[in-house]
Every structure is written in structure tokens, then in C-alpha cells.
Amino acid sequence: MSTAVLDPARVGQGSGDATGPLAVRTDGLTKRFRSGQVAVDDLDLRVPRGAVYGFLGPNGSGKTTTIRMLLGLVRPTAGAAWLLDAPVPAASAAVLPRVGALVEGPAFHPYLSGRDNLARLEAADATADPRTADRRAGEALERVGLSAAADKRYRQYSLGMKQRLGLAAALLRPRDLLVLDEPTNGLDPQGTREVRHLVRELADAGTTVLVSSHLLAEIEQVCTHVGIMRTGRMVLQGDRSALVAHGAARLRVTTTAGTAGEAARVLTGLGLDEVRVDGVQVDALLGSVRPEDVSVALVRAGVGLAGLEVRSPSLEEIFVELTGEGFDVAR
């Protein structure tokens, strides 16, 4: 039984299909470490203005290194990058005040409170207005649900609280671009939902959000555009709806007890690929077969048909379809 393969050229592999103004752009961005390891390889990243761009990939795929290069924390080996039309790192000093960032493993003073840590960040920012610093710090802490712990020492914070403080630091002032590296790391399900809500709220207000994650299912719920990395290279990127539309649709047949095996034989006989039986349900790649033809064939074969559903693939299924690999989310 053959496996259907998604054509990468049709789904925006490499340079992607973004048109119009870009908030983030890289051309051939590459980072090779002294050890010889290539962490990012010839990356063409395209993040449209106003988008929520899910920058996805397994751990170790090059996402954090890319973000560090964009923010001037790591110097690229080759290639070029722009944030909000400004070349970086050449114009970083001018453009970074318009960019909020949460980079993996944010560092704060362990013996200062959350509120005092934000005050130190404000004092170090020459572009910040000291007259509104206290108010903005309070608003940022409230926005991330940390008001009750604002005066606790950072060293007493849990991992999730530390992550929330990092988010608060990125939100001290209105930003044109927000870069979030694994923002749900350490958060419980409620905290994860709050981050998704916050991202939507920021996008509705006109902020472009670049959010990296190894959790496809979480980011898929909020992003408008996606780019998926693997071993330092872009596997695909573009408008999320368009990517999903180009993926191979899957069919789920729900049978009455005792007829799932016969249903699987019928689907295989019709030429459907990746036929899998799970209890009374049978899943398969639909391919070019019409759902109505499947229904007729099942009924004729005496299969007890309780339901038939056609669904679009998830981003994880598209990744597997393109690469033949599972999306390893182990930390």
C-alpha cells in the first residue's frame, strides 16, 4: 500500500508564499557553530505584518537559534535579516525598542521581586518613560496573572511564574512585533489557554506575533501563518488555512460492532492508503476517492455504517506526510 506524499512546492516550502509587507524577513540565514554543527541552514523566513506566525519544529530544529539571531544575541554565519524593514544587527538599536521578546530561559535577579525586576528593566531602557513605569509594570503583571505574586522574590517563583514574568517584561510597552520563544513552557493548561487568549488579543490590536513552539496542537489553535523547521531548515511555511487545504484529507468511518474489519477491507479495495482500525472506527487517507463512493461501497458490503467524516489534516499530520518522520515533542 503506497503512502500519499504532499508536494512541498505546493505548500510554500522554503521562501514561502507571503506577499505584502513583512514584519520579519530572512534571506539565506545560516548559523554554523565552531564545532561544525549547522544549527540554521539557509533559512528564508517570511512573517507578514499583522500575522500570528507559528514558528514550529521539534526541539533542536533551530528555532531558538533563529530567534537569537533576529534579536542580535547570536551573530549569523551568513545571510541577512530584517525586523520591521530594518536590517539587523546593523539597525538593532533603532528597531528593537519596537520589539518585545521572550527568549527561552529568561533571566531575572533572583533576590528581587517580580515588580522590582520589571522596574530594573524599565530603568535600563533609555526609550521608556519613567513617569509611567509603575503603572505599566502593574498592568503587565495583571495581564499575565501575576499581580498576587508581584512582590515575591523571583527565586521563589515556580517555572510557570517565571515564564509569566518573562511575558510581562515583553509587554511593558506596546510593541509592533512580539517574539515569543516557547511561551507555554512550564505553564499548566489554564496558563496555556491564557497565553493563547493573550496572543489573540495582541493580534487583534495590530501586533505581529512570532511564537515558537514544539507543541503543534497548541499553536495550531491560534496562528494565522506557520513555518515548520526540521534540522535547521524550513520544511514548509505559509498561510495556515492554505497549508491545511493542500494536505491529504482523511476519512473516518464509524461502524457498528463487528464490521470494522470488513470496512477496512472495503477501503483498501477502493485504493485508500494508511487504513487503520481502532475499535469501531476506521481511518484512512481519502486520496482521490469520493466520499459518496466510499459510502455506497460500504453499504453494499454489508458494513453497519454509523458515521462517515472527512476532515482536514492537522499540522502534525502534514509534517509527517512531508518528512516521513514523527514530530518528537519530548523535552
Q: What residues fall within each predicted segment?
A:
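Solvent-exposed beta-strand sheet faces enriched in polar/charged residues
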Residues: 27, 254, 278, 309-311
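ABC transporter nucleotide-binding domain
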Residues: 195-285
